Amino acid sequence: MAGLVWVSDREPGIRQLFAELVPEAEVLEPGELTSRLRLGQLPDALVIDGTQLMELPQRVQRRALLLPRLLICTGLSLGGLPPSLVAEPSVAILAKPFCVDDLEAAIEWLRGTPVKVEPDLLAPVVGPRH
């Protein structure tokens, strides 16, 4: 994985899972993530909970959208996220609950590896559209 990766999810189990599968990632508590983004610190990739992202102040949320890779792990339906957010080529969605295949595809996408998305995985993992 190229560059700095941050993982911040409201669920400790999700943070722990990503910490184990992406050992080079830095795991942040939600409050710490907000503070760092407010200070203008930006990683190359961010894994964040969908509700957590929507609760960020607008200015901070806009900074997150400028990242090269933004993986949103969410239990919200895609309709619960702004269409402009979901359409961004630098944004991918990992729907909770997720299976191992979806998680592996999301991690490969984070790493910048082209991911072949199977038709049944298209809804849970939405990556760059070409």
PLM feature spans:
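Alpha4 helix (beta4-alpha4-beta5 surface) of REC/receiver domains from two-component response regulators
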Residues: 76-93
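C-terminal output helix
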Residues: 98-107
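Short, hydrophobic alpha-helical segments
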Residues: 107-115
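CheY-like receiver
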Residues: 115-130
